[in-house]
């Protein structure tokens, strides 16, 4: 009989290593800082360049003043009235007052009413859409203890749009009716203080908002006074 053949060993089959998945390119829409030095950061998003300027951190006086105003007694009644005063800064109250003045105040009232309403709306737009995105200061209740009444706003803190709107309207109104200036500015100051008392703004937020509002209100009054 022929000799039995020895079984041949088969060399193990080498499996090809799995190909590495191609690296995904960075999403151009993702916002990434390209320059960040000190208080200024430059971001690129979807081909657009945005400059972010960090406002100075609230100083010691600012913090102490916030703690004092925010720590004033809170009662159900007082919080309700302060909240109503704060709501005037949203602009609807000033716009409604300006519309009433424009309809009932004759030729002068029309100019004053329109100037007041436009100033209030313009200040709200400038602060909310143009200034706040540059200064991304967080709200007081984010990094420190604060008594917050009502809604906790999700946007940035600096400057105060409510205060800017109120001072803009008060300035425009006082330009046409100087005798109304004390009352108008008292309400505007009250709006700014209410924002601090409710725990949603630092005093410096309200102060800078007031300055911006005065500038916009002056321009609005001058514009409609000239056109009239």
Task: Identify what each model region corresponds to.
Residues 103, 144-228:
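Membrane-embedded catalytic cores of phosphoryl/pyrophosphoryl-handling enzymes
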Residues 77-78, 108-112, 141, 178-182:
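Membrane-helix interface segments
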Residues 102-126:
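Interfacial segments of alpha-helical transmembrane regions
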Residues 80, 84, 109-114, 199, ...:
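Hydrophobic, aromatic-rich alpha-helical transmembrane segments
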Residues 1-97, 128-155:
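N-terminal transmembrane-helix/juxtamembrane module of multi-pass inner/ER membrane proteins
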Residues 72-75, 91, 121, 125, ...:
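Residues at alpha-helix boundaries and the short loops/turns that link adjacent helices
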Residues 118-132, 182-195:
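Small-polar-interrupted transmembrane alpha-helices in polytopic inner-membrane proteins
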